[in-house]
Amino acid sequence: MKRELLLEKIEEYKSLMPWFVLEYYQSKLSVPYSFTTLYEYLKEYKRFFNWLIDSGISDADDIASIHIKTLENLTKKDMESFVLYLRERPSLNTYSKKQGVSQTTINRTLSALSSLYKYLTEEVEGPDGEPYFYRNVMKKISTKKKKETLAARAENIKQKLFLGDETMKFLDYVENEYEVKLSNRAKSSFYKNKERDLAIIALLLSSGVRLSEAVNLDLKDINLKRMVIDVTRKGGQRDSVNMASFARPYLENYLSIRNKRYKAEKQDVALFLTEYRGVPNRIDASSIEKMVAKYSQDFKIRVTPHKLRHTLATRLYDATKSQVLVSHQLGHASTQVTDLYTHIVNDEQKNALDNL
C-alpha cells in the first residue's frame, strides 16, 4: 500500500477508536513502530471492539465510547470466546468455503491485543504516575504456533531462495533477459526503472537488510567506497551494514542516473525514488514487493524481499559457518533466530547419510 493511502487509512481507523487507543498509537509512534504495523494493529482493534459490542460485553453505542474498564474487567473466558469466534466465524472471502480465519491471523490479533494491554497495564503513566490498571488478561492467553520443525521449515524456504550462482543469475536475468518478452509499451516502463530496480535487488541480496530498512535509506546513508549502508533497525537503533561487492556496479549505475531520471532536487534525500508527473517521491514498500515478485516469478519462483534477506543469510552462513556473524549482519541480538540457516545448509548431513 502506498504511504499516502496507508496514512489515510490510519486516520480513518483512528477516528473510530477510544481515547486510550489513540494514546497507545501516539506512544508507539515514538518507539518507533512502523506505520504498516500500526495500521495492522488498528484493524485488529476494530475487529475486537466490534465483537465486544456485538457480544454484549460492552454496552457502548460505538467503538469510540468503549470504556477502559471493559478491558480491565475482561475475563479469560471472555478472551477464549473471542478466539473461538475468530476460529468459527464465516469467512469474508466469497471464494473460500473455509470457516474462520487462519491461525496466523489469530496470532496476529492476539499479538496486537497483548501490545495494547501491556501499554495499559505497564507502560503508561496516569496522573498518579501509575498504569491505568494492572490486570492483564492477555498474559493468560496462549498462542498456538504452527507445528513445524526447523528442518521442515528450512526445506520449504530453500525452494524460494536464490543460492549459489543463482544470486548473480537472477540479477543477470533482470538486466539482460527479462525485457525480451515485453511489449514495446512494457519495455518503456521497464527501461525507466531498470537501473533503480537492479540496484534495489542487488542491495537486498548483498546486505540482507529488511524491506523497511531499504525503503528508509537516504543518500547520506550509503558509502560505496566502503560498501557500507547505515540503517535504522527495529526499535530505532542505528546500525552499519556491510554489502557484498557484487552490488557496487548496480548501485553506481543507479546513482549516475538518479537525479536526471527522477527529477531529483537537493531536498529529495531518499536513496530510492519513484517519479509521477514530474514529482519525485521515496519509493514505498508495496512497490518494491510488487517489483521483486514480478521479476522473481518470471525468473524462477515468486518470492518476497524477505526471501532475498534469507538468501543472503544462507549464503553467508554457508561461506562462514558462523551464526554469530550472520546474526550481526541481519541485526539480530541473538543467534537463535539464525538456527534456521544451519538447517538450510545441510549438505554435510546429506553426504553423511549417502555414505552409510
From Swiss-Prot:
Function per UniProt: Site-specific tyrosine recombinase, which acts by catalyzing the cutting and rejoining of the recombining DNA molecules. Essential to convert dimers of the bacterial chromosome into monomers to permit their segregation at cell division.
Keywords per UniProt: Cell cycle, Cell division, Chromosome partition, Cytoplasm, DNA integration, DNA recombination, DNA-binding
Activity regulation description: FtsK is required for recombination.
The UniProt record lists the keyword DNA-binding: yes
Residue ranges annotated for the Core-binding (CB) domain, each copy included: 16-121
Residues at the active site: 210, 234, 306, 309, 332, 341 (o-(3'-phospho-dna)-tyrosine intermediate)
Biological process, per Gene Ontology: cell division; chromosome segregation; DNA recombination
GO molecular function: DNA binding; tyrosine-based site-specific recombinase activity
This protein's GO CC annotations: cytoplasm
Chief subcellular location: cytoplasm
Compartments in which it is found: Cytoplasm
Species name: Streptococcus thermophilus (strain CNRZ 1066)
First and last residue of the signal peptide: none
Protein's name according to its UniProt entry: Tyrosine recombinase XerS
